[in-house]
C-alpha cells in the first residue's frame, strides 16, 4: 500500500466507466458528493448530470464505497407523475489500483403490475481520469 494513499484523495476526482459514463466526485469526512453523467439511457434524460451522494469507509487496503443517483427522464409521465429511476453502486477501492469494480442496482419506477421488471443489476468498471 502506498503510504501517501488516502480514500479522500483517491475518491476526489473524475472517473469513467466501461459504458462511457463519467462522474466527478468530492470525498470528505466519509461522505461523497458530486455529479454523474450517464451515457446509456432508455429515454431522454432531463439534465446532463445528476447529483451523486454516497459514503465511504477507509479500510486497511483501500475503502468500501456506496453511491446513489436518482435520474429524471424527460417527457415521460406515469399517472401524471414524472418518470424517475434510481441507481446504487457498491464496491471496494484498493489502494494498490487506479481502477475498481462496483456492483449496481437500477430501480425503475414501475406500477405494481410490472414490479418484476423494475430492478436491473450489473457491474461497472471505473477508472480514475485525473
Give each language-model segment a name.
Residues 1-2, 51, 56, 97-130:
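Edge beta-strand at a domain terminus
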Residues 2-96, 120:
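Central antiparallel beta-sheet cores of small beta-barrel/beta-sandwich binding domains
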Amino acid at each position: 500500500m502506498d503510504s501517501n494513499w488516502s480514500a479522500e484523495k483517491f475518491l476526489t476526482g473524475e472517473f469513467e466507466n466501461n459504458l462511457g459514463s463519467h462522474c466527478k466526485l468530492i470525498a470528505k469526512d466519509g461522505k461523497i458528493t458530486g455529479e454523474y453523467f450517464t451515457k446509456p439511457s432508455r429515454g431522454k434524460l432531463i439534465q446532463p448530470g445528476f447529483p451523486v451522494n454516497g459514503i465511504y469507509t477507509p479500510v486497511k487496503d483501500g475503502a468500501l464505497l456506496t453511491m446513489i443517483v436518482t435520474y429524471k427522464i424527460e417527457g415521460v409521465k406515469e399517472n401524471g407523475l414524472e418518470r424517475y429511476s434510481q441507481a446504487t453502486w457498491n464496491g471496494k477501492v484498493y489502494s494498490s489500483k487506479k481502477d475498481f469494480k462496483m456492483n449496481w442496482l437500477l430501480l425503475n419506477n414501475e406500477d405494481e403490475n410490472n414490479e418484476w421488471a423494475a430492478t436491473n443489476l450489473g457491474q461497472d468498471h471505473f477508472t480514475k481520469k485525473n
